[in-house]
């Protein structure tokens, strides 16, 4: 049985494990999705899977450049935490500033975290957010490259595009905290391994061009996400047919 870990934000949550199993007998998919997750928490989840799950292949979909994650210990979470906008990894609770729904900026997220997220976004620059995301992504991709296992890596959207006007049309408010654009002024741009990402085939742009976005006009439909996954991800994973076929 081949084990494949699929890690990311709410886009990954659109994939159904049983549906994938029917299409790919002999493959066990571990779907690790956390709505609103930023790239720091996604990086932590990838390392957790490498160390604990030990998959035969990994799929990682990076999320918004401008999203912020902060880890909190279990005792703090049990005393003050909320059952929203976080990803649990071992004894760490990674709280997210939020994605499409901006969950981390409002109750029941604890006020101390709301204030922290707001201070980050009020004071942050495009270079700051790019640096923070790139640090985690560069390090994680470097580790993946050394593991000698197949992997697929991409962003959920085109990080070189400016979606501020698109967000204004949908919600009459900017979504820069949700998405964000890579700043070419980042200290780490020259180190970023673009050749390790399939950035020409991001799921948001693919679904948008195919007119397969869900009613929120941000997420692909579940069927669209599965179609994108089969077309662009599966061929990169060197999946072997079951031994009894």
Predicted regions and their residues:
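Alpha-helical cap/lid subdomain in secreted, periplasmic
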Residues: 47-245
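Serine-esterase "nucleophile elbow" of acetyl-processing enzymes
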Residues: 1-52, 221-227
